[in-house]
């Protein structure tokens, strides 16, 4: 594309001129011949500016334009509107094919073989000595393009061939534009437009929207030409090259291929103004032909000359995973046309296929109403979105989903594959229900007009294109949020900035729901489709805003840079004001959602140590820990072996000293161990069972010996006192804040309560350095608890209070991770196997951070 560079160049007068900022060019076949291209003018100035010299072909082009206008008027007056439409529609098709097919073929051969340039050289068209008729005409024609004092003989054949090629391009493009515009003018409902242009009704809104689209189209063309100049406008790099790279500025920073994409938005604006579906279909045909020209002519040439900005050249993470991992294959991806990466040996792929078939067959057999199907589609979208967002949120913050599978004996790759299956299944179900819902509305309800249905399908096509471009850029790994599950596989911690991400940071926010809003048009603005589209958009926005963006900051250490659209928008004052407004609204939403809807961090979510300390202090302040509930006597219930931090480590025996007045004592008094949070506010009566965690205080009680853990018992004239122990046979093996309660006789009436204390597992996080040390520590702990047999096996029957859940909590306390009880059972509670698995999980999770 046209840029300037500093170089030493040979000026047309043959003198050496150093360090002048000018665009330097050279023929494609030779980089040694350097020349300074003379000034050229755009198509409109060349044809209609009376101050510029006109060539013979330019005069012919102007004459044909005037002739077509006269023909249109005459045909409309004498042959009628329908015949005139046919005449100019036929002309438009001819000139459009001349453009996309004719010029396309010429440029294809010029790109590959320089056919036009070689033809000019072979027939010496620009040779000063050549005197044949064709040479004289060609030299006469392009001599008008040079300023006075300049000569075509000072420039290489490539340049002169391009100038001649431009004349024929001007002829085809101007006739293409003129015949299309005349066809549209004839199709306009002039009376309807004039009568409703000032009214706020459907016709008035449609007309003004169309006018805005046409004006936007004009701006796109003007801005595009100001960026690429005549050099790229007329495909100059098919003939010669300038010392410059591809330019991404202005409108080229906003949309991919703006000359071919939004550069034709005026077509659809004119279709809206006319309200004629025939005009719309003709516009779509012309636009599709233009895209074919882009795909098969221009894009291959750009990639050949400038290289591709695609990431295809780099081996994707998915390709590396397939090569390096024996049990990994690319995930199933449901596309608009079917399934991609279907693996006949993966059961999950068949589940997705069977689900789709079941939904379609079920709807065919049951034949639900449109409203019923809409309710199902809306409910399914809400439920599946909440599930997906929950998984992603918890995975981002704590690797929850991966940990879930690791705990059950699977690896992190399998966990990621299961997420891929869940995500694709949800997407497939949502889209198949949406398609069926649209079909049922089309069949059973009033469908929209040809125009609304067609525009709805165009929005659907935009979403399909957007999804295709996103997938092409980020591949399967990005499509399935791979950086949430396997961030350790990312070699370069750099966000994508190519493909569609060059223009928009989050294209799925806008174009990713275009097709969903297209169903609103297709279903004639059905309320159910409005609800579906709004719900879809809301969940899409919420996922990007509150889950994806914070996670990207964690993984890549930075937020996405300003997109091309944002950079271009902020060049203009109204753009800066608009962005400022959006930022303020965004901040207000953040403040509202996080201060009003999201609850503040509760005590239960705080740090465990700080949390428990605050609860203990609260209990100590709220009431005395030793209470006289019988009168004014002296009562005492103390824990002997508690440390200064109010902590006892499992499975240490706990010794409790007690004392009550003789009047309050009964031989069947007993002491129970309870979690503070479970006893509630009632301090006079214990309303929950002790679950076997209790002991009698007197050997003369009527209780069994299993619950007589008496160390000492005595009395005097005033008091009865003693001590008991809570050993591993009646101790709790669950961490928490506990208290002892002294109960009167064989009842749950509370006589006194000990001060609360923390019951915790021993802490070895800092001392355990390898798996062998963890195995030894675990076995030692289990021996102390009396549940280890054969020096390697955990026995569930040794202590009914020490369960598989207890062992799971031990690992979690020691290593911040654990395995499921189901996995433990599969290993027959082999401590070596279980502990090695825990260590492996810990290493995997640490590696994923």
Curated annotation (Swiss-Prot):
Q: Which GO terms describe its molecular function?
A: phosphatidylethanolamine N-methyltransferase activity
Please name the GO terms of the biological process aspect recorded for this protein, alphabetically: methylation; phosphatidylcholine biosynthetic process
Q: In which pathway does it act?
A: Phospholipid metabolism; phosphatidylcholine biosynthesis
Topological category with respect to the lipid bilayer: Multi-pass membrane protein
Q: Main subcellular localization, coarse class?
A: endoplasmic reticulum
**Which UniProt keyword terms apply here?**
Endoplasmic reticulum, Lipid biosynthesis, Lipid metabolism, Membrane, Methyltransferase, Phospholipid biosynthesis, Phospholipid metabolism, S-adenosyl-L-methionine, Transferase, Transmembrane, Transmembrane helix
Cell compartments where the protein resides: Endoplasmic reticulum membrane
Can you name a GO cellular component term? endoplasmic reticulum membrane
Catalytic activity reads: a 1,2-diacyl-sn-glycero-3-phosphoethanolamine + S-adenosyl-L-methionine = a 1,2-diacyl-sn-glycero-3-phospho-N-methylethanolamine + S-adenosyl-L-homocysteine + H(+)
User: InterPro entries under this entry?
Assistant: Phopholipid_MeTrfase, Phosphatid-EA_MeTrfase_fun
Q: So which domain of life are we looking at?
A: Eukaryota
Q: Where are the transmembrane segments?
A: 56-76, 86-106, 168-188, 200-220, 232-252, 265-285, 351-371, 376-393, 418-438, 452-472, 510-530
Pfam family for this entry, one: PEMT
Q: Write the Enzyme Commission number(s) for this entry.
A: 2.1.1.17
Give the Lumenal compartment stretches of this protein.
1-55, 107-167, 221-231, 286-350, 394-417, 473-509
Which residue ranges are assigned to the Cytoplasmic compartment in the record's topology? Answer: 77-85, 189-199, 253-264, 372-375, 439-451, 531-849
Q: Which family does it belong to?
A: Belongs to the class VI-like SAM-binding methyltransferase superfamily. CHO2 family.
Query: What does the record give as the function of this protein?
Result: Catalyzes the first step of the methylation pathway of phosphatidylcholine biosynthesis, the SAM-dependent methylation of phosphatidylethanolamine (PE) to phosphatidylmonomethylethanolamine (PMME).
The protein here is known as Phosphatidylethanolamine N-methyltransferase
Organism listed in the record: Kluyveromyces lactis (strain ATCC 8585 / CBS 2359 / DSM 70799 / NBRC 1267 / NRRL Y-1140 / WM37)
Q: Which gene encodes it?
A: CHO2
């Amino acid at each position: 594309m046209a840029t300037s560079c500093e170089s030493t160049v040979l000026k047309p007068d043959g003198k050496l001129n150093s360090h002048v900022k000018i665009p330097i060019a050279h023929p494609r076949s030779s980089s040694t011949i350097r020349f300074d291209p003379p000034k050229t003018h755009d198509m409109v100035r060349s044809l209609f500016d009376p101050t510029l010299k006109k060539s013979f072909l330019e005069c012919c082009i102007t004459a044909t334009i005037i002739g077509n206008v006269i023909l249109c008027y005459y045909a409309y007056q004498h042959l009628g509107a329908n015949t005139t439409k046919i005449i100019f529609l036929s002309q438009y098709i001819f000139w459009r094919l001349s453009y996309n097919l004719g010029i396309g073929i010429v440029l294809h051969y010029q790109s590959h073989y320089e056919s036009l340039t070689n033809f000019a050289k072979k027939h010496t068209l620009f040779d000063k000595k050549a005197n044949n008729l064709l040479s004289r005409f060609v030299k006469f024609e392009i001599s008008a393009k040079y300023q006075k004092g300049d000569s075509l003989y000072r420039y290489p054949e490539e340049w002169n061939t391009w100038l001649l090629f431009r004349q024929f391009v001007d002829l085809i493009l101007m006739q293409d534009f003129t015949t299309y515009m005349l066809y549209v003018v004839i199709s306009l409902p002039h009376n309807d437009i004039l009568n409703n242009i000032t009214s706020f009704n459907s016709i008035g809104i449609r007309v003004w929207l169309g006018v805005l689209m046409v004006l936007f189209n004009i701006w796109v063309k003007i801005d595009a030409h100001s960026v690429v100049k005549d050099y790229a406008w007329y495909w100059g790099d098919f003939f010669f090259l300038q010392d410059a790279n591809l330019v991404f500025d202005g409108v080229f920073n906003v949309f991919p291929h703006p000359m071919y994409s939004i550069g034709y938005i005026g077509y659809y604006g004119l279709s809206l103004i006319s309200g004629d579906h025939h005009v719309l279909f003709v516009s779509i045909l012309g636009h599709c032909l233009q895209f074919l020209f882009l795909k098969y002519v221009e894009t291959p040439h750009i990639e050949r000359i400038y290289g591709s900005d695609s990431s295809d050249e780099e081996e994707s993470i998915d390709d590396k995973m397939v090569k390096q991992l024996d049990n990994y294959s690319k995930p199933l991806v449901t596309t608009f046309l079917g399934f991609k990466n279907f693996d006949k040996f993966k059961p999950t792929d068949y589940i997705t296929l069977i689900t789709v078939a079941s939904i379609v067959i079920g709807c065919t057999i049951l034949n639900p109403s449109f409203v019923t199907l809409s309710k199902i589609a809306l409910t399914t979208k809400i439920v599946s979105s909440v599930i997906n967002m929950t998984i992603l949120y918890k995975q981002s913050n704590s690797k929850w989903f991966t940990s879930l599978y690791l705990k059950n004996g699977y690896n992190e790759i399998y966990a990621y594959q299961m997420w891929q299956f869940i995500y694709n299944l949800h997407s497939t179900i949502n889209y198949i229900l949406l398609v069926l819902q649209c079909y049922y509305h089309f069949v059973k309800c009033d469908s929209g007009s040809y125009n609304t249905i067609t525009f709805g399908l165009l929005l659907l096509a935009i979403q399909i294109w957007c999804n295709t471009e996103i997938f092409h850029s980020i591949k399967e790994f990005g499509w399935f949020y791979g950086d949430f599950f396997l961030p350790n596989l990312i070699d370069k911690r750099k966000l994508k900035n190519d493909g569609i991400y060059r223009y928009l940071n989050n294209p799925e926010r806008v174009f990713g729901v275009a097709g969903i809003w297209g169903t609103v048009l297709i279903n004639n603005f059905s309320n159910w489709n409005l609800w579906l589209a709004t719900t879809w958009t809301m969940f899409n926005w919420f996922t990007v805003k509150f889950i994806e963006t914070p996670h990207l900051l964690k993984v890549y250490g930075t937020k996405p840079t300003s997109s091309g659209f944002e950079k271009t928008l902020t060049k203009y004052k109204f753009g800066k004001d608009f962005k400022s407004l959006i930022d303020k609204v965004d901040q207000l939403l953040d403040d509202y959602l996080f201060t009003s809807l999201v609850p503040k961090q509760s005590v239960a979510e705080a740090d465990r140590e700080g949390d428990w300390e605050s609860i203990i202090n609260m209990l100590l302040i709220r009431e005395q820990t030793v209470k006289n509930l019988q009168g004014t006597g002296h009562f005492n219930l103390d824990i002997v072996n508690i440390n200064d931090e109010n902590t006892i480590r499992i499975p240490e025996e706990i010794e409790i000293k007690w004392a009550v007045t003789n009047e309050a004592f009964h031989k069947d008094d007993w002491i129970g161990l309870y979690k503070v949070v479970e006893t509630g506010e009632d301090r006079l009566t214990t309303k929950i069972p002790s679950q076997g965690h209790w002991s009698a205080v007197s050997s003369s009680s009527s209780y069994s010996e299993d619950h007589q853990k008496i160390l000492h018992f005595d009395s005097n004239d005033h008091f009865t006192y003693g001590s008991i122990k809570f050993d591993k046979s009646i101790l709790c093996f669950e961490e928490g804040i506990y208290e002892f309660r002294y109960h009167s006789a064989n009842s749950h009436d509370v006589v006194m309560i000990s001060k609360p204390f923390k019951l915790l597992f021993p802490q070895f996080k800092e001392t355990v350095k390898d798996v062998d040390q963890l195995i030894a520590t675990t076995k030692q702990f289990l021996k102390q608890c009396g549940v280890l047999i054969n020096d390697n096996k955990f026995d569930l029957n040794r202590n009914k209070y020490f369960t598989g859940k207890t062992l799971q909590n031990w690992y979690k306390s020691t290593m911040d991770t654990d395995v499921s009880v189901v996995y433990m059972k599969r290993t027959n509670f082999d401590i070596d196997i279980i502990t090695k698995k825990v260590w492996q999980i810990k290493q995997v999770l640490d590696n994923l951070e």
